Structure formats: C-alpha cells, structure tokens
Regions:
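Beta-propeller-forming repeat regions
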Residues: 1-176
Length: 176
C-alpha cells in the first residue's frame, strides 16, 4: 500500500505483506519492523481512507479503521483503532481474505470517506460516517477524475483503494 499515513514523514509511505518495515517515498527505511496493524496485529495493507479529519490517511482492513500514529486529539484512549465495525452489528466484507467493504468513498462530499458494509445475516446494510470533527476543507473527492475512476474500478473489478489525481498530505493541507 502507498499512502501518507505518517505526519512526521513528508510525502507518501509504503509497505507490503512481503517486505520488512515501512519506507518513505524515496526508499529510505522509516521503521524496520513496525507495520501499521489492526485486529489480531495483522499488517494493514488493504486500503487507505480519509476518516479522522486529519490530513493523513488511515488504514481500512479487517473490519476496522486504524491510524498509524495515535492522535490523542482524535482518539482519547490514545490507541490506534478508530472504529471496529463489528461493534455496530456489521461484520460482512466482500472477501474473507481482504475484508473489503461493499463500498467506501467520499459520497457525502466533505473529503472524509464513508464505508458501507453488510450485516452478518445479509439483510441490512450499514453506512458508516466519521464523527471526528475537522477544520480541513477539500473539494468533494468525486470531482477529481482519478478518484472517480478509482471508485468505478473498485466496484467493477479487482478491489483496490482510491487514489486522488493530486497529492494531499500532512505538509500540504492547512486548516481553514
């Protein structure tokens, strides 16, 4: 996965299921063994999501959203997990191996992305939207052609994360 998840490292970071550690966009090793992790301490390498109202992205995988670095302003318990969907009755992703949601993206238009998941009995859908306040403002992400096309690809073909046609990261987004 490639995303800006670390506010202390400029630009994108990347990691995978086969490499040791996390790297900066120019290949410099940032950490040798600390991966972004989620439920069961599994490595989070499914998709990145704008959720907490910060300028960096969080990771969406295995039925939860986690932040790489805990932000006490966002999560008072100072833990990385921001939400676990199964606590709200939703534990059905589209794939057992990747636990992709039915849909995720900025469909409410405030740049933070929403998540749609099914109920365990397949009779209901759950739409999750963040409750974290933000002072950041961006245009509706669906107005970006690359983002719009990545949304279409996510739901028609092989599930991959969304990508913008421009860079948004910790050092570029200012509070309004």
């Amino acid at each position: 996965i490639v995303a800006d998840v670390d506010p202390d490292s400029p630009d994108f970071e990347y990691w995978s299921s086969t490499q040791e550690g996390m790297f900066s966009c120019n290949g410099t090793g940032l950490v040798s063994t600390t991966y972004p992790t989620g439920i069961g301490s599994g490595v989070m390498y499914n998709v990145a999501i704008y959720w907490s109202g910060q300028s960096t992205r969080e990771m969406l995988d295995r039925g939860c959203i986690v932040s790489y670095k805990a932000n006490p302003d966002v999560n008072k318990s100072n833990k990385n997990r921001l939400i676990s969907f199964d606590l709200y009755g939703s534990n059905q992703g589209n794939h057992a191996s990747k636990y992709n949601p039915c849909y995720y993206g900025d469909f409410l238009g405030d740049y933070r992305e929403e998540v749609i998941l099914g109920s365990s009995d397949y009779k209901s859908i759950y739409i999750f939207s963040t409750n974290h306040p933000t002072t950041h403002r961006l245009p509706h992400l669906m107005t970006d052609h690359n983002y719009d096309m990545s949304q279409a690809m996510q739901n028609m073909g092989y599930n991959q994360g969304t990508n913008l046609g421009y860079y948004v990261g910790a050092e570029t987004l200012k509070s309004s």
